[in-house]
């Protein structure tokens, strides 16, 4: 899974067996690519991992919504057409993992150079708001991992809530058939 989504993957892992075989020093399977980017991994209490992972997802979603608001306002302002095109491309592709990576690189490049010397104070404020959140431009792939004991018993209520939300999260249950918690 990390080979498919690694550089934009966020993992919430239920405490237990998978924490041991999936994140014990000195041999941790989560690595970085040539850009120094890789999955983020954190674990929570055994019983609340679904809620924990959902909270991670919701926090990122809120931050990205602030980026959307800033870019939407900038596009409606009197700024250079190049900037409008870059922001519009990101707005159109922000919910597609791979396309958002391409568009995000263009946004970061634009933000790093004084291409469109903004003199408008509101525009400067909005550009700063985007710069401050640039690590959230690429769409994250949120994963919630846990074992059969977690998913079918103590964590079921939270997991049911998360799945019923219809939000874009992924759940991987390690069904060992020996009720191995996580």
Regions inferred by a protein language model and the residue ranges of each:
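Terminal amphipathic helices with adjacent charged low-complexity linkers/tails
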Residues: 15, 19-46
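Thiamine diphosphate
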Residues: 18-22, 31, 123, 130-182
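Carboxylate/His-rich catalytic cores and anion/metal-binding grooves
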Residues: 10-20, 26, 62, 69-70, ...
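N-terminal leader/propeptide and maturation segments of large enzyme subunits in energy/redox metabolism
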Residues: 45-122
């Amino acid at each position: 899974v990390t080979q498919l989504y690694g550089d934009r993957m966020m993992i919430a892992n239920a405490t237990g067996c998978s924490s041991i075989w999936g994140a014990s020093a000195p041999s941790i399977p989560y690595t970085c690519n040539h850009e120094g980017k890789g999955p983020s991994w954190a674990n929570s209490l055994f019983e609340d991992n679904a809620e924990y992972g959902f909270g991670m997802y919701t926090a990122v979603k809120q931050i990205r919504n602030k980026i959307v608001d800033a870019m939407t306002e900038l596009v409606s302002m009197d700024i250079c057409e190049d900037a409008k095109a870059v922001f519009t491309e990101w707005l159109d592709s922000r919910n597609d993992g791979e396309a958002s990576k391409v568009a995000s690189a263009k946004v970061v490049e634009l933000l790093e150079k004084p291409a469109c010397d903004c003199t408008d104070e509101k525009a400067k404020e909005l550009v700063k708001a985007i710069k401050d959140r640039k690590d959230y431009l690429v769409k994250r792939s949120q994963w919630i991992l846990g074992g059969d004991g977690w998913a079918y018993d103590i964590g079921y209520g939270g997991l049911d809530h998360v799945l019923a939300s219809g939000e874009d999260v992924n759940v991987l249950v390690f069904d060992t058939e020996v009720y191995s918690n996580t």
